[in-house]
Swiss-Prot record:
Residues 291-316, 468-496, 516-563 are annotated as: Disordered. To T.pallidum TmpC. The lineage of its organism: Bacteria, Bacillati, Mycoplasmatota, Mycoplasmoidales, Mycoplasmoidaceae. Residues 546-559 have a biased composition (Low complexity). It comes from Mycoplasma pneumoniae (strain ATCC 29342 / M129 / Subtype 1) (Mycoplasmoides pneumoniae). It is found in: Cell membrane. Residues 469-495, 526-545 have a biased composition (Basic and acidic residues). Keywords: Cell membrane, Lipoprotein, Membrane, Palmitate, Signal. This is Uncharacterized lipoprotein MG040 homolog. PANTHER family: ABC TRANSPORTER GUANOSINE-BINDING PROTEIN NUPN (PTHR34296:SF2), TRANSCRIPTIONAL ACTIVATOR PROTEIN MED (PTHR34296). Its main location: membrane. One of its GO terms (cellular component) is plasma membrane. Residues 294-304, 516-525 have a biased composition (Polar residues). A lipid is attached at residue 27 (S-diacylglycerol cysteine). Residues 1-26 form the signal peptide.
Amino acid sequence: MFGKGLVKKSLLFFSGVSTMAVFLVSCGATRIWESSIQLLVSNDEATLADKSFSEMSYEGIRRYFRSQKHIELPSPNSSLLQDGNGLWKRPGRTLSDRIATFKNIKNDGSDVIVATGFNQQEALQAISSDDRRYLADKNDLAKVGFIFVDGQIEKEYNVINKTPQFRSTPLNISSVAFRSDDGSFLTGVATAVYLNLNQDYFLKKNGATNNSSQDLTVSGFVGVPIPSTLSFLNGFRLGIAYFNEVIYTHLSDAETTSDNKSNSSSASNSVLVQLKQMQGNDKKIKKIKWISPKQGSDNNSNLSIDDHKSGSFSSTEPRATTIINNLLDKGVSAIIPVAGPQVNLAVNEVARRKAHTAIIGVDSAQELLDINQDAPDKDQLIKGNKKIIPFSSIKALDVAIENMLIAIQKGSDNNGYKGFGYNNIGTVGTSSVGISEAGYEFLIDPVFWKTTQSQGKSMATNMTNLKRLSSDDTNTKKALKEVSTHKNGSDKDGIIGKYSNLLTKKSTTVTAVAQKSMTDNNSGTEQKKNLSEVDTKKKEKESKGKTQSNGQDSGQQNGKETNDIISKYSKLLTMTTMNNKVMSSKKQSSDDNSFKKTSENGDWVIKGDELTKKKSTELPAFAKGADYPTFPTEAVSVINGSTALDGKGFKWSFKQI
């Protein structure tokens, strides 16, 4: 499950932990490397050390060589790494260019090409197709393995009038797409809490040309509106909506450890306690409003995705700077830029204008990178790291790539990832998406209600069906209790897992947190079991053992508080049922083994305790969108029973030549 270990290993910073290092001898010339694995960046404008997509992908290769071969590859910002020197290449601009680059990498002696970004798909579909025009290319590259990052190979690609451009059987390709909406959902929830706990700071609207608003506001933009970027944006909006319509609505019913007269200092400092205290004072918790980057458009009932795109992933994109400054003019409280290196533009503009605005990181834990800066008037921030980037929505490309390489090498699954012939899915459950560690302290246990709703007011039996349980049962109260979420010393796997499992249930009437049996007054023991359920029986047994052995909450071990926040969120976030999907707008067939796209207008929000596609005052729906995928929650075979390429015989080597 997603936890501290993942985040720390995903930050792009690694110490010299290998038992064998590559020793470099200076000779005044560019070093040439011979590697079984090469990275192919997304386009000719991309660079390796981008603090984002390309760099995280390269780190996956580094992680593989470090863990499996005890070899330390050069760091991504090393001057010894240049385009075409044997470790990474740019792909070219056309279909034929990309196929030629595949062959060049093969001629370098590489066995596996890690091809990143949606731009690679057409070439990969071509060389795995039955199209006679590409038969020679297919045969030439048949013994080369490919990992397609941030997309999926389709059996029928680009279907127009029922005729596909390519029919593909990817015997030598393993792909991975990411449920980035899951990770950014967590980030949206944490952002809403972070802004509220720092209300005084963000309501000053420093740096704004119009600072009269007393709203906490957020916005975001993408570089190009493609499935992988829209997934981030819509998941973030859903997390904000979850705070507005569920957490905000039911906060007065929250049961906290302080309600049980706990003397724990950690309990008194927990975010749930602090939010309840705010509700009881003159300073009220605020719902979070979404504003448009377009000037003068905030009163419109509809939003356009066209106003939320910069048009490229260039680090110098002028439209990105315009979008950022438009939002700063409006006094926006937080921005999530899903546009690669353009997060750096956002940080620099906030610093230049001394704006009281948070920038939410994307892909890696960007709050730890050197692009981050101290927040203007940082001492006025009560909570958080006092930086412009407080935390990030993680898409752990490095974790996925490392696991896929290991799966290919050994010819069997590795940590939920499969090898050639499969479309893999990066989820919270496979430790591939989530929120960075700095955001953990702002995640609220989603199961915090203490009273039972009447049958007439019970919530719908879908995603937000978090039934309020009876507070007179000791085990129920213990299971529902919000546990401290300090940045240090707290394991959040439990809560994320609960969220994940809630949404991975295939039945619309059964969830991990709100089982039908609970509404039938099931025993407290059974309720506790349901609430603390995690992905494996081992974890469930361990949790039960902790409670029985020391009489304390199941989240305590060796005097150090842990909790199950991550587990709960994980259960909430990956439901395969159509009604519970975060981003589904067309009814799923009973066969969920396919990738589906929708171009319907709008995106999902939570309204009135239900997950629906409708407008709300705070988050109007997008009136114009682009295709985004609804992914299955586990790897899917796309080779129709054919025999995939065997990678166990690859060299799996790296050396200087």
